[in-house]
Amino acid sequence: MDLTLLQWGDAGWGDELARGAMMTVVVAACSYFFGIIFGSLFAAAKLSRFWSLRLLGDVYTTVVRGVPELLIIFLVFFGGGTLLRTIANGLFGYEGYIEPPIFVIGVLCISVSAGAYATEVIRAAVLAVPPGQIEAAKSIGMGPWLRLRRVLIPQAARFALPGLGNVWQFTLKDTSLISVVGLVEIMRTAAMGAGSTKQPFTFYITAFVIFLLLSSVSNRGFLKAEKWANRGVRSQ
């Protein structure tokens, strides 16, 4: 293991690995943000009184959770390129190759996958809120939006935090899959460094350490958030 390969500047790959780590964090954060949005919308659909919305939510979670994330990435990447070419040809007569933006593809695919898992977490959290609290809010004249903001969301968020922490960990690790379509994050940088220097162990053990550090730091953050959310709550 040659640690000199990890130094900064032209003589090493330290700065490239740092940029790859930053890209991983950015992709994971964006994907998690949109995943929570997808999860909230589809959780609401699965809790709806309308069967069509419940069916839509069931189809989304079943399909996305039943298909490998890598396959979703390939389908969206190559299917997105085909769709863009079709639109460009129909509107402007352009017949050349159009490559969809890799960052957008990566965030879209990972957020769709994260959203499927977040859907079930949020749905379970909403169902865990004691019905008596909702009835009490109704009895004192709270409207639907006020009940949602003052009763349902704060309580459901407390129940959802542990599961959403797991969704974040999955999302962070899934960013490594985007390297197959060319996005330069940690794994892509490690692969390029390994191929260039013929020292694969050095770069992959470095990627291992970076992912472990990111995972550990974010895990501590979620534990602190859970502790804050449960302040004043009696332990059963």
Curated annotation (Swiss-Prot):
Keywords: Cell inner membrane, Cell membrane, Membrane, Plasmid, Transmembrane, Transmembrane helix, Transport
One Gene Ontology term of the molecular function aspect: transmembrane transporter activity
GO cellular component: ATP-binding cassette (ABC) transporter complex
Residues in coiled coil: none
Transmembrane segments: 25-45, 63-83, 102-122, 199-219
PROSITE patterns: ABC_TM1
Main location: membrane
InterPro entries tied to this protein: AA_ABC_transptr_permease_3TM, ABC_transp_permease_HisMQ, MetI-like, MetI-like_sf
Gene3D superfamilies, sorted: MetI-like
UniProt-listed Pfam families: BPD_transp_1 (PF00528)
Keyword Membrane: yes
Membrane topology: Multi-pass membrane protein
Entry keyword annotation includes Transmembrane helix: yes
SUPFAM superfamilies to which the protein is assigned, alphabetical: MetI-like (SSF161098)
Function (record text): Component of the nopaline active transport system probably consisting of four subunits: Q, M, P and T. This system is also capable of transporting octopine provided that catabolic functions are induced with nopaline.
NCBIfam families with a match to the protein in the record: HEQRo_perm_3TM (TIGR01726)
Protein name: Nopaline transport system permease protein NocQ
Lineage of source species: Bacteria, Pseudomonadati, Pseudomonadota, Alphaproteobacteria, Hyphomicrobiales
Gene from which the chain derives: nocQ
